[in-house]
């Protein structure tokens, strides 16, 4: 669910997704 990502800019979303990918790795 990406509902908690509402309000973030496209750059913020990219950084968040990369951060989450790093945590999951």
From Swiss-Prot:
- Where is it mainly found? secreted
Q: Which residues cross the membrane?
A: none
Tissue specificity note: Expressed by the venom gland.
Note the superkingdom of the native organism: Eukaryota
Localization (cell): Secreted
Q: What cellular-component terms does GO give this entry?
A: extracellular region
> Which keywords belong to this entry?
Secreted
Per the record's keyword annotation, is Ubl conjugation included, yes or no? no
Q: What else is known?
A: Elutes at 29.62 minutes.
Family from the record: Belongs to the non-disulfide-bridged peptide (NDBP) superfamily.
What does it do? Unknown. Is not toxic to mammals.
Recorded protein name is Toxin Tpa3
Say which species the protein is native to.
Answer: Tityus pachyurus
């Amino acid at each position: 669910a990406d509902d908690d990502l509402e309000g973030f800019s496209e750059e913020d979303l990219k950084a968040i997704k990369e951060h989450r990918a790093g945590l999951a790795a």
